[in-house]
């Protein structure tokens, strides 16, 4: 996890050299405040937004970077594309699905689906993907998940340990259940 945070921070330092008008959304505040700050930063037309945060019903996303493009949107004569860093050199489908979700959430605000989205791997290689090639699958998965949620008996849920536990905001709650 520490390597991933450092990898992301290194790219932020590099991007700040190229994109002078930048902002960091404070990650240590409520989801509502992070989302409001992100929307304000989008409307204010920053060239680089670090740690952008989106919420839409059952979905949320914290994007490493949003970079401004010259493609018009409801924000103005510009729009944004998603860039996310991964420490691994072997990108996986789940990484592409993740940035597709971010691009979907971004499209709800800017009124325009980004054309491309990007992953920067652990070897510092930037991989670009067409959002349109993955959006239908993401929406299909999202729709099925939303249909599934009401059918779940919440009393039957039990958290399973996974590789994301160390960075999950629910870790304290899960540990309470595991110990109890």
Positions of the model-derived regions?
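Metal-dependent nuclease catalytic regions and adjoining charged, substrate-binding loops involved
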Residues: 90-94, 105-178
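Short, charged/polar micro-motifs that form catalytic or ligand-binding hotspots
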Residues: 55-56, 87-96
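Metal-dependent nuclease catalytic cores that hydrolyze phosphodiester bonds in DNA/RNA
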Residues: 1-75
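Conserved ATP-binding subdomain of kinase catalytic cores across diverse folds
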Residues: 97-101
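Conserved catalytic cores of phosphodiester-cleaving nucleases, focusing on short active-site segments
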Residues: 61-71, 76-89, 102-104
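Beta-sheet entry/capping signal
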Residues: 47, 64, 79-81, 114-118
């Amino acid at each position: 996890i520490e390597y991933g945070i450092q990898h992301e921070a290194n790219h932020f330092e590099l991007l700040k050299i190229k994109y002078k008008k930048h902002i960091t959304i404070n990650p240590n505040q409520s989801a509502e405040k992070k989302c409001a700050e992100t929307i304000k930063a989008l409307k204010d037309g920053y060239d680089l937004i670090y740690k952008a945060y989106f919420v839409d019903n059952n979905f949320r996303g914290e994007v490493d970077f949003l970079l401004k493009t010259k493609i018009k949107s409801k924000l103005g004569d510009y729009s944004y594309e998603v860039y996310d860093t991964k420490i691994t050199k072997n990108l996986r489908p789940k990484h592409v699905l993740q940035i597709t979700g971010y691009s979907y959430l971004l499209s709800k605000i800017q009124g325009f689906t980004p054309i491309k989205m990007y992953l920067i791997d652990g070897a510092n290689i930037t991989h670009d993907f067409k959002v349109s090639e993955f959006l239908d699958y993401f929406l299909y998965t999202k729709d099925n998940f939303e249909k599934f949620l009401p059918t779940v008996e919440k009393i039957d849920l039990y958290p399973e340990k996974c590789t994301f536990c160390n960075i999950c905001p629910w870790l304290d709650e899960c540990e309470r259940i595991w110990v109890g």
